Amino acid sequence: MENHPQIRLVAGLGNPGSEYMATRHNIGFMVVDQLAAQFGSTWEKSVPQAREDALSAKCGAVLLIKPMSFMNRSGYPLFAVAQFYKIEPQQILIILDDLALPLGRLRLRARGGPGGHNGLESIIVQFGTEEIPRLRVGIGQAPREGYVDYVLSRFFDEEKPLVRSTIGRAVDALKCAIDNGLVSAMNTFNKTETEEA
């Protein structure tokens, strides 16, 4: 684990289109947008000849990706981009929303199953491995019924300050993983506020 490969690609998951902008399910897009903005990067089509759309931006030597194929098909464009740039699954860091985590909580993992997330499941199926690092961003627990409506809803006004600070911490976690390695980022950002106190 200490010798985890250098991260070369960071992919934020979400749904394209203005109707999905700023929804809970699109927190992955929000995080990579913030990271791209910090580096003054602009989004452009990543692999012109690819059949599946994705937008890309540069963050130093790291490629940022937003799959434009809708969440449940995220694996197709991401796999095409990784093949084009010869990037291994262990060199990719996925950012996704997580219903099981409280709003504001981050959880970095080097591997694992999809945990009920269709976007991550699509990626695992396309790459044929669960050895893909991921940063799960808590969006709060949905009501027992209607979780689809919940993940496609926008954050409440009273949640927005916490959402902004969470996006900032997620960007810091990504930069730490890129600069210092995945293990260092996990040790720093997987702690809860009570553990840090």
Show the residue positions of the predicted features.
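The feature captures the short pre-catalytic strand/loop hairpin that immediately precedes
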Residues: 144-154
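Short glycine-enriched, charge-decorated loop/helix-capping segments at active-site entrances
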Residues: 107-113, 152-155
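Nucleotide and nucleotide-moiety/phosphate-recognizing core
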Residues: 1-111, 121-135, 142-146, 161-196
